Amino acid sequence: MEGELSGLPTVVFEHHAHIYLGGKNVELYHFGRAHTNGDVVVYFPADRTLAAGDMFTFGDATPELIDYAGGGSAKEWATTLDSALQLDFDTVVPSHGVVTTKAEMRKYRNSTLALRNRVHELIVQEKTRDEIAKVMQTEFHWAQLHLDVSLNGAIAEMQ
C-alpha cells in the first residue's frame, strides 16, 4: 500500500451512523456493551445482512469471551443482542465461524443470558472460583483463555 495510514478511524459516531459503500446504504450501530464496550454492528438493509462483529460468534468452538479489560459485560450482553435482533435481517456474519442466520444469533443471545444467570446462581450458592470455573468449562465450553480473560470479571459483575 502506498502512503501512510494512521490507523485512526475516519467515521466516528456514538449510537448510529449512515454511510455509503459501493453505492449501498450501510448503517452502523452501537447498541451497548457485549464482548467489549465498543462492539459495533454493520447493517446492510437492502441485503438483509448484519455483520455482528465480536458480539456474536458461531460454532461450538467459539463461546462467549467477555473482554472486561475492553469494557465488556456479561450482564449487558443479552440486552445488547436484543437491540441488534430488532433490525430486519436474515443473514448474519459473525466475527468467528461461518455465515449463519438470525435464528442462530437469537440462540446465542439465549446462551449469553444463560451464562449470566448461571454465574449469578453459583455466586448465590457461594461456590468457589474453582467450582465456577469447572461449570463454565463443562456447561459453556470455556477454554483456559476464557477463564483467564473473563471469569474474575464475570464473578465481580454478577455479585
Located regions from the model:
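Alpha-helical interaction segments
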Residues: G3, I66-D67, D130-I132
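Metallo-beta-lactamase
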Residues: H18, N25, H30-A114
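Active-site HxH/HxHxD metal-binding segment of metal-dependent hydrolases
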Residues: M1-H18
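Accessory terminal helices/loops
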Residues: Q86-D88, V99-Q159
